[in-house]
Amino acid sequence: MKINLKLMENNISRSDIISVKKFLNKKKIILTQSKQVEKFEKNWSSWLGVKYSTFVNSGSSANFISISILKTLNKNKNKNEIIVPTLTWVSDINSVIMNGFKPIFVDINFSNLSMKIDEILKKINKKTLAVFLTHAQGFNGLNDRLLKILKNKKVHLIEDVCESHGATYKSKKLGNYGLISNFSFYYAHHLSTIEGGMICTNDKKIYEMSRMMRSHGMLRESKNPKYESEITKRYPKLSPKFIFLYPTLNFRNNEIGATIGLNQIKRLDSNNKKRILNFKNFLKNLDGNKYFVDFDLKGSCNYAFPIILKTKNINKRNYFEKKLKSKNIEFRRGNAGGGNQLRQPYLKSILKIKNFNKFKNVEHVHSFGYYLGNFPDLKKEKIIKLTKFLNSLDIR
């Protein structure tokens, strides 16, 4: 009998569709970025606990704009390195490269799939501008030691919280600790606007820059009349409505995406509680002799069930995948972003790293790590059925 587990189900609910219909039935509506976007940004800021949020068309765009802001504000051009994880989404690395920085890669922990903090600290030097830390799969990647040293060395922290909405460190939501934090609202994430992302900060200048960089670099998007007046006087031969300060593109979202976001945020906390409970039930019933189960759950808010096989046998791995397919269980090998980014073609001409043994943990996850779907509607009975099946497989 098939188990039939997808990576995500029912993430756009009937309630979301009704909210969109209600919005579209209004007599006078604007579909491009307008009041719904502003309201969603305010509600998200309130939920997260930050001063400012900027709604964009994807988490990847949020990443790109954040690093573009760092580049613009960076006055010491000798600081041209940004420390990044080997396990992350491709846009984190590409945002660094496309803005002219050198990515410095760090291996991960099995316990939270985030960067090894000792390795981060070893790689900080005079050239380090920032640490771009991914909170993967709903796990927290921070500790006090890292935060203290980054502050003392004046190294910026950028948080990628795309997969970890609602996860916390010391009871404060992730996304509150960095100079800038980024979120994705892609279909399978904790909150979805189908496609979308958010840039969050407590810094007013960065907020204004994010608004401008979201929209072609246009001055009039800054939402700062005094600043706009000052710049307009500086460029008297330009139309005040068409002054472009930064070399960027259009990353705006729209009113329909914001309407879905406004409806989804109402149930985000309750959905997150279900995800957390699902993950605990999954780990409780999973065979620790065959699979890694010692994850750090403190403050976590699970995005998808991580599976790390203990075996290093490729034949066992292939058998495992064949069995999952036979039960119609959807999976992704390599976990977040497909595994070790250093193995991807886009980096071949940029970095000449051939010795992957320096990154042992991500190498194992690359070949023997997976994630399976976890979502609020997933029933405990199906989780038990899933773990019984996984435990029955001959992969030791």
Model-derived segments and spans:
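N-terminal "arm"/small-domain region of PLP-dependent enzymes with the aminotransferase-like
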Residues: M1-I30, L245, G373
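Conserved PLP cofactor-binding pocket of PLP-dependent enzymes
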Residues: M218-I231, N281, Y319-K358, H364-Y370
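Active-site phosphate-binding strand-loop segment of PLP-dependent enzymes
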Residues: S111-T193, M198-E208
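Phosphate-binding glycine-rich loop
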Residues: I30, K35-E81, S95-I97, F105-D107, ...
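Conserved PLP-binding active-site segment of the aspartate aminotransferase-like
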Residues: S184, N302-N313, L342-I353, S367-K379
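Active-site region of PLP-dependent enzymes
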Residues: S164-K170, Y177-A304, G338-G339
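Conserved PLP-anchoring active-site segment centered on the Schiff-base-forming lysine
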Residues: F64-K123, A130, L324
